[in-house]
Each structure stands twice: as structure tokens, then as C-alpha cells.
Design a protein with these regions (language model features):
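Secondary-structure junction motif
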Residues: 37-60, 129, 136, 146-147
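Flexible hinge/capping segments at coil-to-helix
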Residues: 2-43, 130
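A late-sequence structural motif
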Residues: 105-148
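Short secondary-structure boundary/capping segments
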Residues: 4-7, 29-31, 59, 96, ...
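Short alpha-helical
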Residues: 45-46, 75-76, 94, 115, ...
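Short beta-strand->loop
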Residues: 4-14, 101-114
Length: 151
């Protein structure tokens, strides 16, 4: 193996929408999302892989949605969601502040749970391996000081 991989924390994936979206703050069945536009990262990204895995686990596919938009950055997803262009699935820790500020809302899905490990990865035996280990220690120390964030 050419890489070192260390788990930092576990994060929940949630469904997000604009606060003005008809499903904002509601609890729905997965299929109730289908009439809406789905916004997601481009094929080949980890986010895309996670989304396809989530949808597959619930007998869904991107083609079950009324339409979909594939974009290149998470910031573009956030902006489109805030503008009520559609809904998306993202790591909760990435949008927590926007949820707290009320510029985004969560759609709760019956019997839906999706957690992923967030890892720190670097090339083994690289010139920067020792600095990466030091940075990893700093990250772990910082995250442990925050306690259980329910990320």
C-alpha cells in the first residue's frame, strides 16, 4: 500500500434544502424526494460515490428524481440549495453552521442513517510523512477537545 490512512472522525450524511423548500424540516419517505431536483458533485468524486451508495441502499438512483444537476464544487451545491434550485446529500458537519443560521434546512428521511469515516491520508515514505503525522496529531487533539460533536 502506497498510502497511510488514519481515521479522524465519523460524520452523518443528511439531506439538505432551502428553508423555503416544501419539505424543509419535514420527515418524509425516501420516494417523496423524487419529484424534486437532486444536486450532486461530479462523477469520480468521493461525494458522488457516497451518494450513489446511499441511493442504491434505498432502491433509488439519480434517475428516480425529477431532474438532477451535476456540479464541480461543494460551494456550488450550497449556493444552489440555498437558492432553492434543488436538494442534496452532504456531510452534516460541512453545513452545520448554515443549518444553525437558518440559511439551509434539513429534510429528515424515515429510517435513513448514513455515516462515513473522515480520514486523513498521505503518501507513505514521502518527504512530508513526519509533518503529516504531526498535523494528524494536532487534528486529533483538537477534535478530542471538542468532545462528541455528533458530526
Amino acid at each position: 500500500e502506497d498510502y497511510e490512512c488514519h481515521e479522524l472522525f465519523e460524520s452523518e450524511t443528511i439531506c439538505i434544502c432551502a428553508p423555503t423548500h416544501p419539505l424543509a424540516g419535514k420527515t418524509v419517505d425516501f420516494k417523496e424526494l423524487n419529484p424534486y431536483r437532486l444536486i450532486f458533485r461530479e462523477e469520480g468524486s468521493k461525494s458522488y460515490f457516497n451518494l450513489r451508495s446511499i441511493l442504491h441502499g434505498y432502491n433509488q438512483d439519480i434517475h428516480n428524481f425529477a431532474s438532477f444537476v451535476e456540479v464541480g464544487t461543494i460551494n456550488t451545491i450550497h449556493n444552489l440549495v440555498i437558492e432553492n434550485v434543488g436538494l442534496s446529500f452532504v456531510y452534516k458537519f460541512v453545513v452545520q453552521k448554515k443549518l444553525d443560521l437558518g440559511v439551509m434546512s434539513q429534510i429528515f428521511i424515515n429510517d435513513f442513517k448514513s455515516k462515513n469515516f473522515i480520514n486523513y491520508v498521505w503518501m507513505k515514505n514521502s518527504f512530508f510523512a513526519e509533518k503529516n503525522r504531526e498535523f494528524l496529531d494536532i487534528c486529533k487533539h483538537y477534535l478530542s477537545s471538542l468532545g462528541d460533536l455528533n458530526l
